[in-house]
Amino acid sequence: MSAIGSQKRLTPPRISAMKGGKPIVCLTAYTTPMARLLDDHCDLLLVGDSLGMVLYGMETTIGVTLDMMIAHGKAVMRGVAKACVVVDMPFGSYQESKEVAFRNAVRILQETGCDAVKLEGGEEMAETIAFLTKRGIPVMGHIGLMPQQVQTAGGYRSVGHSEHETSKIRRDAHAIGGSGAFAVVIEGTVEPLAREVTSAMHIPTIGIGASAACDGQVLVSDDILGLFNDFKPRFVKRYDELGKRVADAVAAYAEDVRSRKFPAADHTFKRRP
């Protein structure tokens, strides 16, 4: 591990202790340069399986592999000095059994040096989370809209509108709260329900398209920076339009090359006397 990664960082217990306090700031990171830029400003960095869509052009997160998550987890860890780093367990790496989940979670922690793993699911995954946490693996849960289940859920849509959905999310929150998870992401959930769940849980809730009452917020970094333009979720606030700025910079470079303005004398090497 690099020297920067060996310095004191926020830990899952410290994140858990932030329940009800100053809101927890979380963003996604997939690369070393981005991790370095985000680290000073974030409490949590999530190496999300959203990288499949953001970096690899996939339509969903289903095609993301364990090896991909580990590679990007390693990259992020090289750029972090302060933030707690959580790596997503990709689809198929934990659903088969709690023993398979344990083996794959151990791989992620050992090979990346990250602080915790995150997995999606409510009641059906509570036993697996408990199995992992009892064996020393910090776990963040994920309820509400679950992107890895998008193909069976009928697409990306907010949840908690019907009594059936509301009841399920309440049960999921209760199950995850009792599983030993140190925090839980609640995604794409109607605001009143997300607020209620946050109040009822003893662990921090990290909202994404949920409620300002959540104990923290997470967004995809490329979304808030305007670097990912395939689609823009309603819950995203754009803080810059870097995509346009990158395109403008590249257009200026291309023009300089074609007009032979670049490289200028300052960008070339002189023969030594």
UniProtKB/Swiss-Prot annotation:
One of its GO terms (cellular component) is cytoplasm. InterPro entries: Pantoate_hydroxy_MeTrfase, Pyrv/PenolPyrv_kinase-like_dom, Pyrv_kinase-like_dom_sf. Mg(2+) binds at D49, D88, E120. Belongs to the PanB family. It comes from Rhizobium etli (strain ATCC 51251 / DSM 11541 / JCM 21823 / NBRC 15573 / CFN 42). The active site is at E187 (proton acceptor). Its main location: cytoplasm. Keywords: Cytoplasm, Magnesium, Metal-binding, Pantothenate biosynthesis, Plasmid, Transferase. It comes from the Bacteria. Its EC number is 2.1.2.11. Homodecamer; pentamer of dimers. This is 3-methyl-2-oxobutanoate hydroxymethyltransferase. PANTHER family: 3-METHYL-2-OXOBUTANOATE HYDROXYMETHYLTRANSFERASE (PTHR20881:SF0). Pfam families: Pantoate_transf. It is an enzyme of class 2 (transferase). GO terms for biological process: pantothenate biosynthetic process. The gene is panB. Catalyzes the reversible reaction in which hydroxymethyl group from 5,10-methylenetetrahydrofolate is transferred onto alpha-ketoisovalerate to form ketopantoate.
